[in-house]
Amino acid sequence: MQETQRLAVELPGLSLKNPIIAASGTCGYGQEAAKKYNLNHLGSLVLKSTTLYPRQGNPRPRVCETSAGWLNANGLQNVGITAATNEKIPWLRKNYPQLPIIASAAGFSEDEYVKVVSEFANTAGVKAIELNVSCPNVKHGGMAMGTDPEVLQRLVKQVVKAALGIPIYVKLTPNVTNIVPLAQAAEQGGANGLTMINTLTGLSIDLKTRRPALANVTGGLSGPAIKPLALRMIHQVRQVSSLPIIGVGGIESAEDVLEFMMAGANAVQIGAASFHDPLACPKIAADLPIVMDRYGIKKLTDLWEVRF
């Protein structure tokens, strides 16, 4: 079997050469990551979460390292939907015409989400849209819409209409008692897939200043610390939903990728690993067939049948 066949993954709107997707917020709009490596090594990438208008983000410092990951409170800093659709995405299409683009829509009201999704849906090259309803470090909006199943279902219904057939993947927050009702709400609202999980709200304190390490006080925890939680939540949701799941949370190796797919994910995103190694995504993609051979895995999609 050819390597391309072993690694290929088909999801709604996305034909991926491999399951490795650069997570939103780790590669900007592609131009930043392209300075480090050839983006064609990826299955896909998710653009920076984009709002209706440009945002400067939260005060600095916004990022700090923890013992098992990172805390970030960027506050949805982005160029706004007009610049994203008129400048950023055309650059990606011109330089990487074969790379499937996943846009990421964020907002502070249902109306804003609908407008952003509508603009992305009318932009050539966008193959899928990730709905970021789980950002833990902005006030008013963001995660607030992703913690109430009824509100989430209503929002998803509206953005699915605005998407004009472009698949919608809802990025779920782990900052809830039970993530399953949120997954079910997204599915009932018409979502084509789920991305899980986003970061967990955390706090780090600077002993010298006796103040929080982040100006925003709290931030989103990512990295190896959240991997077991992500695996558990993906497994929980897979028991009740057949929607495609893109797993994310602490993945740092090809072995981690296989764990996520055995837990119920159909593809994965690499996030925090790219902070300490900008080449994490292409390295993991290159390692996958080697590790698959080690564990006797002929093709990745065989792991979709794993159940426990």
Swiss-Prot record:
Entry keyword set: Cytoplasm, Flavoprotein, FMN, Oxidoreductase, Pyrimidine biosynthesis
Record-stated family: Belongs to the dihydroorotate dehydrogenase family. Type 1 subfamily.
Metabolic or biological pathway: Pyrimidine metabolism; UMP biosynthesis via de novo pathway
Subunit and partners: Homodimer.
EC number: 1.3.98.1
Biological processes per GO annotation: 'de novo' pyrimidine nucleobase biosynthetic process; 'de novo' UMP biosynthetic process
Gene3D superfamilies: Aldolase class I
UniProt name for this protein: Dihydroorotate dehydrogenase A (fumarate)
Uppermost EC category: oxidoreductase
Cofactor binding: number and manner: Binds 1 FMN per subunit.
UniProt xrefs under Pfam families: DHO_dh
Function recorded in the entry: Catalyzes the conversion of dihydroorotate to orotate with fumarate as the electron acceptor.
Protein origin, superkingdom: Bacteria
Localization: Cytoplasm
GO molecular function terms attached to this record: dihydroorotate dehydrogenase (fumarate) activity
Annotated FMN binding sites: 24, 48-49, 132, 171, 197, 223, 249-250
